[in-house]
Design a protein with these regions (language model features):
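Intrinsically disordered, low-complexity Pro/Gly/Ser/Thr-rich segments with frequent PxxP/GP/PP motifs
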Residues: 519, 524-528, 618-648, 730-734
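Sec-dependent N-terminal signal peptides
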Residues: 2-10
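Terminal connector regions
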Residues: 543-556, 641-679
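Cysteine-dependent hydrolase recognition
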Residues: 11-551
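Short edge beta-strand/loop segments characteristic of extracellular beta-sandwich folds
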Residues: 491-497, 591-595, 704-708
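Short acidic, flexible loop segments centered on an aromatic residue
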Residues: 506-512, 595-617, 708-732
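Low-complexity, acidic Ser/Thr/Pro/Gly-rich terminal tails and inter-domain linkers that flank the onset
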Residues: 472-480, 559-584, 672-698
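Short, solvent-exposed loop/turn segments enriched in Ser/Thr/Gly
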Residues: 486-490, 584-591, 635-638, 652-655, ...
Length: 734
């Protein structure tokens, strides 16, 4: 069977699949179908990752196309559409009819994974990162805070929860995560467990340790609703090492030697005596993809001929590589069998800050039930000032896995990285798991099918880590170095090293307990913010973008003798519907309260002017007098007045500028208000032809269309016009 990109449908949707035309012809398969063969038992033929379909079993049906059983993803059902290669169809046209339109909304983390797997989904690349939940034993709490602080400054909404808050059992922790998922704003998209399984428990599935069940919140299936990783450490010293690795990898990457950013290492072990020959072809495929993506050096250590891999692997890792990708057939919890490389060899590395991501697609090496397993050794190696080993490790805990699933998993991880441009570690490795599901949607057994592999492979590391795929570039960032208390607007300009604007850079402003704003730069490299600065302190400014070294700066918020600015406002729409909101066609009375945030000087002869360049707003009464405002005091005036266009859209943001003048100085404040309007989405249509509900050639039918008001205002006196864009269809009554 061939699985198309997945279809994403809500639980209320229905769909119809129709073969419009087809040419029936026998197809000569290049290689036979693979059986479920356990590594390292004889397979008998080579499977190229270019043809994953041939690793799949036929559906057992003569139907050329089928819909597989759904699984749940967030608020939607996910259906695989399966084409059966043994049905004898060489060419076909496939039409998929949706009886209900769905505006699909996925958080940034899941959107990365599914953007090229779902037919009816349009990816929005600037969705902001959301929640990060760190769960830690009480004894590790203080050691975790530097990581939480860095992530917070980057723009994440970080919560650090002690086991004394979550509960100490796996069930209690899962319940805590579930509650956060449903009730927090924003909900966590990433979860970091801090400690080995003796510190933070895991689940056991098919007798193997796994963290995957923590991620399955919605539905009765095995798909993740969020991403998880474990900093599997045994003590505070190990934890300090791992956190130092993560922070420095993201914030201050090693650039004394930049060649390591474009080097990787492929390690594979075939077993020709058992005719297990797929690992090396799989690694050659991944190697080719790296080279095609601009990597100039992709080392290989293959068995045969290399049996003892210590020297070759050590030399490559010490030179510096960004990824180490192993695919083999025999391993143990302490390392790879062929080419051999074990825990003691990891300890002997000296790669310092040139830390790779290790993906170990083989049995046992990620079994964190052992102490320490191979993956834990890579993660913990070194110390905070002289690290070595890896930044993260992705591997399996069970003692047995199968080649045809492992090959798909390996392929999917690096397809996600190199083709789909998935750079966050949790989504990148989960893309590998989804490749397993895409190729085996009908084989989902928890003991041997897709579900088994979702549980089998776990991430030892930070799932929110953004990996490097090129030599880091540098920003030039411009912003005010100091601002007075009371300032409520702040602009950041982001340029590259050639002084050209950088579009799409994420800018985070963070002032403890007061300001947390995240935005993206526009085509001019500018990000504008409305902020709160009621007290003196440091406003941290952090700018990030993939393959740019983060800018970590700040502006000092200082007291001033006198500073008058926006404090609060009230809206009156008594001449409209009197709901206290800005709606189409209304006249708004806007009362703005100003405050003197200064600490010593009275502001006199204060006046303010309200302006906007918004095409939907006309300010008709724009200038107001406020008189005298003493330090720390507030003052009101009569309302400003503006008219709202009938054509304003729902959730449209109106940007006002408040120019304040006085005998002492002039200032500017920002004010942003949202409008509410009716907004209608197409939902579904019904073809009332008295027959099969399908509009067919020569047929005249009634058409009923259902719409939904997804806006913030009741819609009244609605009218609709129907037009046909198909020359073969005429609308009689429009």
């Amino acid at each position: 069977m061939i699985t198309l990109p997945l279809l994403l449908l809500s639980a209320l949707n229905s769909l119809d699949i129709q073969i419009v035309s087809r040419t029936e012809n026998s197809i000569q398969l290049k290689i036979p179908f693979a059986d479920k063969i356990l590594e390292p038992v004889n397979i008998g033929f080579i499977i190229s990752p270019e043809y994953p379909v041939y690793e799949c079993l036929e559906t057992g049906s003569n139907n050329p196309v089928e819909i597989g059983p759904p699984v749940t993803l967030k608020d939607y059902n996910l259906y695989p559409v399966i084409l059966n290669p043994v049905a004898g169809i060489k060419e076909f046209n496939l039409e998929i009819h949706f009886s209900k339109y769905q505006d699909i909304k996925l958080p940034h983390s899941l959107a990365q994974v599914f953007k090229n797997l779902i037919l009816n989904y349009e990816y929005n690349p600037e969705t902001k990162p959301q929640g990060l939940l760190i769960i830690t034993p009480n004894s590790f709490y203080n050691a975790v805070l530097p990581l939480a602080d860095w992530k917070e400054k980057k723009g994440w909404k970080v919560t650090v929860a002690r086991l004394s808050e979550t509960g100490a059992s796996a069930t209690a922790i899962k319940n805590y995560i579930t509650n956060a998922y449903y009730n927090w704003n924003p909900p966590p998209e990433y979860v970091i467990l801090v400690g080995d399984k003796d510190s933070v428990p895991c689940f056991t599935v098919s007798s193997n340790p796994t963290d995957h069940p923590y991620t399955t919140i919605k539905g009765n299936d095995f798909l993740s609703d969020l991403f998880i990783g474990r900093l599997s450490v045994a003590n505070v010293n190990d934890l300090n090492t791992v956190i130092a690795k993560i922070i420095n990898y993201e914030r201050n990457p090693y650039t004394t030697d930049t060649l390591w950013f474009k080097r990787t290492l492929m390690v594979a072990g075939n077993y020709p005596d058992n005719q297990m020959t797929t690992p090396i072809p799989t690694k050659r495929w991944v190697r080719e993809k790296f080279l095609n993506s601009g990597y100039y050096q992709v080392d290989t250590v293959f068995y045969p001929p290399v049996s003892n891999g210590v020297t070759a692997v050590t030399n490559s890792v010490n030179q510096g590589v960004t990824f180490v990708n192993y695919r083999g057939g025999i391993a143990s919890w302490s390392g790879w069998d062929r080419p051999s490389f074990y825990n003691t060899d990891v300890i002997g590395l000296s790669n310092n800050w040139k830390l790779p991501v290790v993906t170990s697609i083989v049995c046992l090496t990620g079994n964190f039930n052992a102490e320490p397993c191979f993956g834990e050794t890579w993660l913990r190696a070194g110390n905070p000032s002289n690290p070595k080993g890896a930044i993260a490790f992705f591997g399996a805990s069970p003692p047995t896995t199968h080649s045809r699933w492992n090959n798909c998993l390996d392929f999917g991880i690096y397809h996600g990285l190199l083709i789909d441009s998935i750079y966050y570690l949790g989504p990148m490795t989960y893309r590998g798991k989804m490749e397993v599901y895409v190729n085996f949607p009908l084989e989902t057994s928890p003991d041997s099918g897709s579900e088994f592999y979702f549980n089998a492979y776990n991430l030892l590391g930070d799932p929110s880590l953004e990996v490097w795929t090129d030599v880091p570039r540098n920003f030039i960032v411009n912003h005010q170095p100091t601002i007075p208390v009371g300032t409520n607007q702040f602009s950041v300009q982001v340029l590259n090293s050639s002084s050209q604007p950088v579009k799409g850079a994420m800018v985070s402003l963070y002032k403890k307990n007061e300001t947390k704003e995240v935005g993206f730069t526009d085509a001019n490299g500018i990000a504008n913010f409305q902020i709160t600065t009621n007290t003196p302190d440091t406003l941290f400014v952090t700018v990030t973008k993939h393959n740019f070294k983060p800018y970590c700066g700040y502006a000092m918020v200082n007291n001033s003798a006198v500073y008058v600015g926006y404090y609060n406002h009230t809206i009156s729409d008594a001449g409209g519907n009197n709901n206290g909101e800005i709606n189409p066609g209304e006249t708004i009375n806007l009362t703005i309260t100003l405050k003197n945030f200064g600490n010593s000087t009275t502001a006199t002869n204060v006046s303010a002017k309200l302006t906007t360049d918004d095409p939907f707003i006309t300010v008709v009464d724009s200038i107001k007098d406020y008189g005298t405002i003493t330090p720390g005091a507030t003052a009101n005036s009569s309302p400003f007045v503006f008219n709202v266009s009938q054509n304003i859209k729902n959730n449209h943001t109106i940007k006002f500028n408040i120019s304040v003048s006085s005998s002492q100085c002039n200032w500017n404040s920002a004010l942003r208000l949202n409008a509410k309007a009716a907004e209608f989405d197409y939902q579904r249509c019904y073809i009332l032809d008295g027959g099969n509900g399908i509009l067919e050639p020569g047929e005249t039918s009634d058409l009923t269309i259902s719409i939904k008001n997804v806006g913030g205002l009741i819609g009244t006196n609605l009218q609709g016009v129907l037009r046909s864009l198909n020359p073969g269809v005429s609308v009689i009554d429009s």
